[in-house]
Amino acid sequence: MIIPIRCFTCGKPLGHLYAVFKRRVLAGEHPGRVLDDLGVTRYCCRRTLMAHVEWIDDVLLYERRS
């Protein structure tokens, strides 16, 4: 799993928040409220967490050719 460690725009550390954010959103909480509770107030940081897509499992299905 490759998660964003820092915000792409401002550089604020976000890696420690991603697991909590994902767990709470999958449990049915509103993403905006979760981000507010975690103290993520900047638009750039909110975008980084909300727009992240875990694609590593899909990429691993393809074989590498020499």
From Swiss-Prot:
* EC number(s) per entry: 2.7.7.6
Its main localization is cytoplasm
Gene Ontology MF term list: DNA binding; DNA-directed RNA polymerase activity; zinc ion binding
The protein's required cofactor(s) are namely: Zn(2+)
User: Subcellular location, in the record's words?
Assistant: Cytoplasm
Q: Is Lipoprotein one of the keywords UniProt gives this record?
A: no
**How is the cofactor bound here?**
Binds 1 zinc ion.
User: Catalytic activity annotated for this protein?
Assistant: RNA(n) + a ribonucleoside 5'-triphosphate = RNA(n+1) + diphosphate
Listed A to Z, the keywords are: Cytoplasm, DNA-directed RNA polymerase, Metal-binding, Nucleotidyltransferase, Transcription, Transferase, Zinc
Per the record, its GO cellular-component terms are: cytoplasm; DNA-directed RNA polymerase complex
Q: Which residues bind Zn(2+)?
A: 7, 10, 44-45
* Database matches in Gene3D superfamilies: Homeodomain-like
Cite a single GO BP annotation.
DNA-templated transcription
- Enzyme class, one word? transferase
Check the record and name the PROSITE patterns matching this protein: RNA_POL_N_8KD
Any one Pfam family match given in the protein's UniProt record, by short name: RNA_pol_N
Q: Which InterPro entries match?
A: RNA_pol_su_RPB10, RNA_pol_suN_Zn-BS, RPABC5/Rpb10
Q: How does it assemble?
A: Part of the RNA polymerase complex.
Q: What does this protein do?
A: DNA-dependent RNA polymerase (RNAP) catalyzes the transcription of DNA into RNA using the four ribonucleoside triphosphates as substrates.
Q: To which protein family does this belong?
A: Belongs to the archaeal Rpo10/eukaryotic RPB10 RNA polymerase subunit family.
The protein's name in its UniProt record:
DNA-directed RNA polymerase subunit Rpo10
- Species per Swiss-Prot/TrEMBL record: Pyrobaculum aerophilum (strain ATCC 51768 / DSM 7523 / JCM 9630 / CIP 104966 / NBRC 100827 / IM2)
Q: What is the lineage of its organism?
A: Archaea, Thermoproteota, Thermoprotei, Thermoproteales, Thermoproteaceae
The gene from which this protein is expressed is rpo10
